[in-house]
């Protein structure tokens, strides 16, 4: 009798496991936030996408990112000319004028070597 009850329990447990199926429900959504900015008694609304939200039965994952600016950055002009900064003192002006003379003197010494 004990053996037959074990077979019946095994059959019931097997049929219960056979009807169970693993399933995962996934919901992927993008969150949009409305930002209201006010300046000088004027307000305007801007919609900003904050990221992607993935929801499963076990966990929720939030993916965020920094949005890229919509305006282009200014391009710096490339100039090949060199400028000398302004000199504010008389000693500075004398030193600025002396630099080419010293360089010329060193070049002259190099010619004799």
From Swiss-Prot:
It is a lipid-anchor; GPI-anchor. A lipid is attached at residue 92 (GPI-anchor amidated glycine). GO terms for biological process: amyloid fibril formation; cellular response to neutral pH; filamentous growth; filamentous growth of a population of unicellular organisms in response to neutral pH; fungal-type cell wall biogenesis; fungal-type cell wall organization. Glycans are attached at residues 22, 80. Belongs to the HWP1 family. Cell wall protein necessary for cell wall integrity. Plays only a minor role in hyphal morphogenesis and is not critical to biofilm formation. This is Cell wall protein PGA59. It comes from Candida albicans (strain SC5314 / ATCC MYA-2876) (Yeast).
